[in-house]
Amino acid sequence: MDILEYIEQHSTPESEALRQIVHTTHIEMINPRMMSGHIPGRVLSMFSQMIRPQRILELGTFTAYSTLCLAEGLADDGTLVTLEHNDELEDMILRNLALSPLGEKVQLVIGDAMEWLSAQSSDWLYDLVFIDADKREYSAYLDAVLPLVRPGGWILADNTLWDGHIIEEAYDKDKQTLALRAFNDKVAQDERLDKVILPLRDGLTIIRKKI
């Protein structure tokens, strides 16, 4: 038994819906590792349950595993809006959302995240935002979502350690690595934000908007 197996055995198990999503994702997708997975999913669920958000925004749906994890903490009349750029995933996402009653609280938007964000009004504020889309756009996503997050609201950003590449010189010319470094620096230097990076899988940054 390795440490990950130990952690999984001592954590809340996945729901049947999530197990089905894991199964179909591994069968149908070329890169199933893009899915959050059991322990990161439990962290998303636990975080959402702690704050009981009325409104959640997710950038990057993939196969909706993380979507349903986040939805576990929604207020009874809460809503989760999830954005996915790849229209080829739409049917699979809708099938997966239908596996759980929580899927009824989810609004799927297919299209470019930046275009959608730029059209939103700050009259509709989110309690929690999860960023897990194009790594090269993380800094732009942050600028776009900050006005849409309520004061005291939360932003979670996935993959911010990028499998450790973030500090490796061998990746100094890799565009995704450079973009994530810039994002991490941007967050660290922004005094409007409280922040911490957790060494969970590829790195998870927790951000609280102060004002």
Where are these predicted regions, by residue range?
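A short alpha-helical cap/connector motif
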Residues: M1-L128, K135-L156, T160-I211
